[in-house]
Amino acid sequence: MKILYVTKALIAPPYAGCMQRTVHIARQLKPCGQVTMLAINRRFDSDSVNVCRQEFSRFDQILLRSYTDFPKRRGELLRKFHMHWPTLCGIRADRQGQALFETLAAQHDVIWFHTLGAAQPFSLPRTTPMVMDLDDLNHCKYEQSARIQTTLRFRLSAHVQSYKWKRLEREALKRYAAVVVCSEQDKQLLGGDDKIFVVPNGFTLPAEKPTCGPPDPLRLGFISHLAYGPNRDGLIWFRDRIWPLIRREKPNMCLRIVGRIPSDNDLIRAEGFEYLGYIDDPTEEIQRWSAMIVPIPYGGGTRIKILDAFSKCCPVVATSIGAYGIQGEHGRHFLLADEPQKFADYCLMLSSQPERGCQLADEAWALFCEKYTWDKIGRSIIAAAETVAKTPSTDVTGKP
């Protein structure tokens, strides 16, 4: 089988969850046969290109125009239009890019798109079976965002965006031979159709189980790419509503923040917040945390940061949305709180009772090994690809 894997999220370094999902799904597809990666974006970094060329037998790129390539006023109008009208979500490939895509599509048995944004720039073929990995359900993200907006304008905008994305996501069920989502909950939100495959996010299984503790009782941690809205808004909520409650009880508590920081303007500042930047292997750092916090107020898919904590035997305190899609139990695998005082209490408890944190971490490790290693998830990925490869070409609509 020959699989064309199309993505806008490259993989070096994998500082965002979508990048980790991209590389691991593409790797898990290799047992099916030859995998060609087609990357589309407005810019490429040399590290990502070099890694992809080493990872895959064939790697191609299509460079899309950027909004800044247009005259200033037109570029701004296009950006706003594409943001508010996801049906036309972005800039189309030029003739050369479309021709390359058509050539590759004709040479492969299955096309696997990572998100609707990877398919949008092209006119799609009518004869090659296609898989759409929705990753996040954007309609859920906007629906949840509407609940926390403080102005009528932003609430209405979020509701409208949610409606538009819901239509697009449901239309994907008609346009693609299979649709992939991150959780059983997401599958049911789309109607539970047999052509929907659940491929959860995962994490790499360490060579051996990490040691749990002893943590630093005055150290909490957060893994975040702050350019991503749910991460940024979640950290602001934590800073404003929860951090003062924690520091009132333990004035020397610090929050260690790991993740790429696009610019100083993206820093969310507070006394005790320590930014470490991107760390290629944060295992030793995470093992010193008394807990990893996941104060996410809205979003879709599943939180790779929680699975990262599970794989490193670090206890987790999260909001219910922060733990969405993960088949864990409150009080057994993690602690969940949507109310600021309760969230703060859980953080303080784990700081003072490391043995309780180790109990949570041990149960979370067992759950991770059972359900969330990429070796286990790979079975669902291969099943989706093999099922789609058998789809008669007449079942593929090819609508753009």
Feature-to-residue mapping (PLM):
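Donor nucleotide-sugar binding/catalytic pocket of nucleotide-sugar-dependent glycosyltransferases
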Residues: 131-132, 139, 159-166, 170-208
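A short, well-ordered alpha-helix in the C-terminal region of glycosyltransferases
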Residues: 349, 356-371, 380
